[in-house]
A protein has these predicted regions:
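Short, small-residue-biased leader/transition segments that mark boundaries at the very start
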Residues: 1-7
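ASCE RecA-like P-loop NTPase motor cores
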Residues: 8-276
Length: 276
């Protein structure tokens, strides 16, 4: 790899131990253990070793440690993202808030857009299934002023991307349609944006404040990233829901036959909630 020299590298470059390490790394293969570095210096050490090597991934043992490491590493490299694992215990709360999903989508976006970035995660996060780069990039929808849009098809596509339709956009992951005005709040953006149509042609695009509804900036084009990691078509989603409901019905009936009415109710309720 070709090192990109930076002023932040200089403290490390002056250390004989670091220079010896750099000289040895190209000759080594497999898992390499480096010891003797205090915790406070680890982000600097990792940055200095990995700088100029394309995309990098840092894996640590615990979520809180990963968050702290991402924040500390950001001092050396602004193109860093924290990728949280999918926590089953807090799955329902994240459905409502989209906080963890937004962090994962932002990490995927960074990998798709940046030539060089650093992702910080845990072993659990590393084992999470995720879409291939081609699948993720192909799901991104670009809209530019002058484009022709089929409104019905476009809103159906937003639903497939994981966006929830609402009367008025208030939080990320929502969209609304009022006549020829489409409001969308991507998980990857700080503010929603408004697409105004003249008949079926995009007349204008601008970002706006979700609370005041005031316009912020006119835009020539926008990229709409998915609001979920697994993008399904309506047909795939309907087939999956039908299968879940059918299996839940079988489980519920079996539990009722065993006089386990409470467990049967919970199984059916969980399936109904997923279907909604």
């Amino acid at each position: 790899r070709q090192r990109q020299m930076c002023i932040r590298d200089r403290p490390m470059q002056g250390l004989k131990e670091f220079e010896d390490l750099e000289a040895a790394l190209p000759k080594l293969s497999g898992v390499i253990q480096i010891s003797g570095c205090i915790d406070a210096a680890k982000p600097h050490m990792m940055y200095s070793i990995g700088n100029g090597s394309g995309n990098r991934i840092i894996v640590t043992f615990q979520e809180q440690k990963a968050k702290e490491l991402a924040e500390e590493y950001r001092f050396f490299d602004p193109n860093v993202a924290y990728y949280p694992a999918k926590d089953i215990l807090f799955y329902q709360s994240d459905i409502r808030g989209n906080v963890l999903t937004a962090e994962r989508i932002n990490a995927l976006k960074m990998m798709a857009e940046k030539r060089s970035c650093t992702i910080v995660t845990t072993f659990d996060g590393l084992m999470n299934p995720m879409p291939s780069p081609d699948q993720f990039i192909s799901a991104v929808r670009k809209v530019a002023v002058g484009d022709v849009i089929d409104l019905e098809q476009f809103t159906r596509h937003l639903a497939e991307l994981g966006y929830e339709k609402n009367y008025q956009v208030q939080t990320s992951g929502e969209f609304s349609v009022r006549g020829g005005i489409i409001d969308i709040f991507p998980l990857t953006e700080e503010n929603p944006f408004r697409i105004e149509l003249w008949d079926d042609e995009v007349d204008s695009i601008r970002s706006f404040d979700a609370e005041s509804q005031r316009s912020i900036e006119n835009l020539d084009e926008v990229h709409i990233y998915p609001a979920c990691e697994l993008v399904l078509t309506k047909e795939e989603r309907d087939a999956g829901i039908a299968r879940i409901l059918a299996e839940a019905k079988q489980v519920s009936e079996k539990l009722r036959g065993e006089m386990k009415t409470e467990e049967a109710y919970r199984a059916k309720s969980a399936a109904d909630q997923v279907a909604e």
